[in-house]
Amino acid sequence: MAVFTAVSDSDLAQWMRHYELGDVLAFRGIPSGIENSNFFLTTTRGEYVLTIFEKLTAEQLPFYLDLMRHLASHGVPVPDPIPRDDGALFGLLHGKPAAIVTKLDGAAELAPGIEHCIEVGQMLARLHLAGRDYARYQPNLRSLPWWQENVPAIVPFVSDAQRALLEGELAHQAAFFASDDYAALPSGPCHCDLFRDNVLFAHAAPGTGHDVRLGGFFDFYFAGCDKWLFDVAVTVNDWCVDLATGVLDVARADALLRAYQTVRPFTAAERRHWSDMLRAGAYRFWVSRLYDFYLPRAAEMLKPHDPGHFERILRERIAHTPALPETHTACN
């Protein structure tokens, strides 16, 4: 979400001719993140986000945009892609795929409490179930094959201890992914990047009995078809940790996981491999952050994340992982 590709006023004016969104009132780059170029766009018709996709190809993009439309049609609050005048959900800007989506209400909660975790857990389970009949398929592009391809490029930059952990965990995950239990885990479209800054909350309406309302999930451009438990693990590793140490906050994790399984109970195989999947979720982001830190791309506004954060989380998950909470009756 850093700005890698600049958009001038004349570029924007030409681009907006393909949309019926009124006159542009404001336009500014979003500096956070490291993958795509994102801009807040305000017009006389409303508020939107313009994204230029720096890595995803025109062949890959329909999976993500159509998934967002599919989830929205099933009641999951996500950004809605805006069709162009030819009906397409994206076009080319500076030779790169680009799209406009609706901007969700609310703000990110960077210090979540129990109620935030409950809201996220329930909606993540609803997202998984809503995606069961989604017709397109795209694997998680940052899964085991990506790790195997890119870890060798990273190891020259790290310490001996880090190299041992990188290579040892890669071997552990490769064996896990090859197991019959892994093959049996429930799967489908996953967000794969449901961090605190990819969820918005708004104030709940009076009389609802809640202090917060989930405004929506966004930034689906790491989404892919994967094991649902991986998506849960990625989410817990961000929403339910002490950011300074990586230690799991058991109360928040318990709240999120219990809320999730009121919608979709965990299977026996998922319970057996919760620790493995928490490790996989931590490893995925440690590897990608190491790659972005040591092998960055040029960008106008680039703020690489600290790789050490997910190294600490991975070491913590290897040392200790509580069991999944007991199953509750599902409700849809």
From Swiss-Prot:
Family per similarity comment: Belongs to the pseudomonas-type ThrB family.
Top-rank lineage group of the source organism: Bacteria
EC number(s) reported in the record: 2.7.1.39
Taxonomic lineage of the native organism: Bacteria, Pseudomonadati, Pseudomonadota, Betaproteobacteria, Burkholderiales
InterPro entries: Aminoglycoside_PTrfase, Homoserine_kinase_II, Kinase-like_dom_sf, Pseudomonas-type_ThrB
Keyword Cell division: no
GO MF annotation terms: ATP binding; homoserine kinase activity
Biological processes per GO annotation: threonine biosynthetic process
Catalyzed reactions per annotation: L-homoserine + ATP = O-phospho-L-homoserine + ADP + H(+)
Keyword Nucleus: no
Protein name as annotated: Homoserine kinase
